[in-house]
Amino acid sequence: MDWNRVEGNWKQMKGKVKEQWGKLTDDDLDVINGKREQLEGKIQERYGYEKDRTKKDIDDWYGRQGW
């Protein structure tokens, strides 16, 4: 997985992230700024997910982006 693609295109990706994880706020997305670790932490915080589930959900979401 090449997370640099997400990070490098964060402005475009924010909408897709928000579609998947609607509890994330615009402020959350600004703080995340494309950083996977920040995204994992905010998803865990907003949804109460365990770390393993969060990582799997992000991997699944990334895989559906068609890269």
From Swiss-Prot:
Gene3D superfamilies: YjbJ
Domain of life per record: Bacteria
Pfam families, per the entry: CsbD (PF05532)
SUPFAM superfamilies hit by this protein: Hypothetical protein YjbJ
Family to which the UniProt record says this protein belongs: Belongs to the UPF0337 (CsbD) family.
Name this protein carries in UniProt: UPF0337 protein Atu4724
Native organism: Agrobacterium fabrum (strain C58 / ATCC 33970) (Agrobacterium tumefaciens (strain C58))
